[in-house]
């Protein structure tokens, strides 16, 4: 299993396929979905990291969670692999990390796809905001994937949730000026019943200079990039 030492973190990542590089960024408390890599690998060299405290990457207890730090870890991994520039595809939290990379490292991103991602915490629906603010880590059942993959063990689940909660309850906080700094052509995908407010998705679409907005009918938060993302990227 490949790991890279980046920013004091022993980061797990997977690489499959040939072609132009594409960085896949998973959602919160997850790893990259198994079917995701084979979908893109026939066309791209897919690089799929797992962020701190998630998937097969251990938690660093002394370092708080912030989307910006995840973005910097991802850029450091790209540098470690000799990847100067890549398409970036992110789901949920991964899309937020992708936005951060595109804002602060525009030269690194050739194209950007986000699904179910917000630019501001207030872009979540009121119900989602309330859930994230009142999340009780001790009452959330351990995800099977976390228990199976985490080097920290299943007992660390409430600990890492408690550490993630301040980020989830307050971030991201990108301004329209931040979004206007994105140079890469961008595809924003949301479900019409997503946790992202539809009006917020429109605000993001208007603020990002080279953006397209795709609203998937009869879809909730579980929409993963598919054919619409692939046609946009190639």
Regions found by a protein language model. Name each.
Residues 96-104, 108-143:
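Flexible "cap/lid" loop of the alpha/beta hydrolase fold
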Residues 195-200, 224:
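Conserved alpha/beta-hydrolase "acid-adjacent" motif
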Residues 162-178:
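Active-site nucleophile elbow and catalytic-triad environment of alpha/beta-hydrolase enzymes
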Residues 184, 198-206:
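Short alpha-helix in the alpha/beta-hydrolase fold that links the catalytic acid
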Residues 182, 188-190:
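Short beta-strand/loop motif that positions the catalytic acidic residue
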Residues 7-59:
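Conserved HGGG/HGGXW glycine-rich cap/lid loop of the alpha/beta-hydrolase fold
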Residues 16, 41, 47-89:
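Active-site loop/oxyanion-hole signature of alpha/beta-hydrolase fold enzymes
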Residues 211-234:
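Catalytic active-site module of serine/aspartate enzymes centered on a nucleophile-bearing elbow/loop
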């Amino acid at each position: 299993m490949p790991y890279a030492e980046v920013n004091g973190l022993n980061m797990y990542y997977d690489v499959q396929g040939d072609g132009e590089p594409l960085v896949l960024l998973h959602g919160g408390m997850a790893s990259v979905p198994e079917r995701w890599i084979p979908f893109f690998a026939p066309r791209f060299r897919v690089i799929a990291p797992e962020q701190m405290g998630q998937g097969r990457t251990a938690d660093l207890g002394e370092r708080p969670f912030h989307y910006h730090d995840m973005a910097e870890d991802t850029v450091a991994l790209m540098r470690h692999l000799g990847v100067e520039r890549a398409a970036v595809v992110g789901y949920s939290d991964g899309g937020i990390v992708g936005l951060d990379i595109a804002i602060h490292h525009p030269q690194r991103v050739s194209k950007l796809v986000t699904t179910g991602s917000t630019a501001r915490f207030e872009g979540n629906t009121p119900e989602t905001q309330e859930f994230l603010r009142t999340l009780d880590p001790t009452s959330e059942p351990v995800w099977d994937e976390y228990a199976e993959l985490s080097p920290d063990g299943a007992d660390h689940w409430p600990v890492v949730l408690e550490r993630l909660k301040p980020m989830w309850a307050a971030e991201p906080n990108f301004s329209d000026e931040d979004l206007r700094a994105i140079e890469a052509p961008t595809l924003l995908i949301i479900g019409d019943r997503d946790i992202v407010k539809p009006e917020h998705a429109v605000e993001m679409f208007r603020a990002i200079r080279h953006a397209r907005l795709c609203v998937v009918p009869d879809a909730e938060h579980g929409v993963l990039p598919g054919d619409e993302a692939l046609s946009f990227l190639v």
